[in-house]
Amino acid sequence: MPQRHIFLSAYGQTSFFSIQTYLAMSSIISYTLSTKRHTGIGLFLGLIPLCLQTLHADPLAFEKACLQAFKGEQLPEFSQNLTQLRKARLAQASRLPNPSVFYEQESARSTDAFNESSVGLSVNLDFIWKRGSRIKAAEQKNSASEFELSSKQLKVSYEIANMFIDYANWNKELKELGTSIKQHEEALTISRKLLVKGIISAFNLKRIELRMDELRFSYKELESNLAGLLAEFQLWVSEEEAIPANANLLYDISFETAEKAVEHALRNRPDLLAFEANSKWKAEEVKKYKNEKIPEVSLDISAKKYPGDNDGFFFGMSMEIPLGEKQGDVQFAESEKVSGTLEYKRAKRKVEREVKAAWQIWHHLQTDKNSSLGRSQMSEGKNYLQGLQSSFANGEASVIEYLDGLGSLLTGKQNTLKRHHLKQSAYLRLTYLSASTPSFSTPKI
């Protein structure tokens, strides 16, 4: 069954430059109106660094941002080192014993009747039945190391993906706050005209100014969060002035049930697979140490020279019995095996809990269709506000009624954006915990 791609979008896409410049201009205008003072050239010049910084910003696609973050975390170097370590570990486990060459001279004092010499070669033979277990143990350890590296890559991708959705949603929230600030500025202008006509009192102007102060504080707080996010993102990708591309998160991974999500996670979670590989490695270590207790056997072959012209050939075998040197190795390895098995089972239960909880949250947000304003409701709200503004300008609606209308519309938009953000975050967490890779589609500008 083909999977359906669902694009995450809300109220259109707006560039970071247009949002920031618009909000900065709105703040300056509102400051001028509320304090009844002229702005001055100094405040205007304050916009120049912001505009220049944004113009030079370089949007990064999700895939490129992940690659640069991998480099920043030195994961390519870790991968290269892991390759060398993997080769070295296998070479160490599969190496053959070095043969030893020996020379012996035997003679009796005060006589030449007994004078023997021999040249020979001695080879350790225990590698024949010990080498296989050593190689298997090394291979399992290599697998564990590879999964650990994959787990780091998955974690970095998840962090970058969260920055992408945070950046996009916070920009949309900033845009809505800027629009609301502008609407309140218009309300303040209308109120001044009504004050001159004697329709309302000066107290109503103060009420609007207090509401604008609240909006400006919310805007500044969100702007600070966005600045912190950009600073962190630029450190992640090791590139100054870089910003996340204005991308759409695709809902292209579907798990019909929590059980299917858990099954996918158990098969693909690199951190869990690393625990499993470590458990198998410790089991192979037990086999290896049991084989190490088998006596070491060496084969000796030599040519002997006897007194006179007599030559001879010597063949022999020697055995080293490990009475004390290997004691405790098997018991230690068996304890480590039990520990590895318990760690894997605990990690498996943890994965099951995490994925089931993440799936339930995502499923609830995905199936709840009545939790946010739709486009038709948003259009109705805007039409209602336009009518209310007209009534307010004619003195038919009170300041409180108009402010309540503005506040309700902003709250509805904010709740829609926050719900949208929660849905994206829940989806990302589910993909991360189930070891699935999220994908973004960057729209054409």
What are the language-model segments listed below?
Residues 99-137, 246-255, 296-332, 441-445:
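Small/polar, glycine/serine/threonine/aspartate-rich low-complexity segments that form flexible
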Residues 195-199, 391-396, 433:
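A short glycine-centered flexible hinge/capping loop motif at secondary-structure junctions
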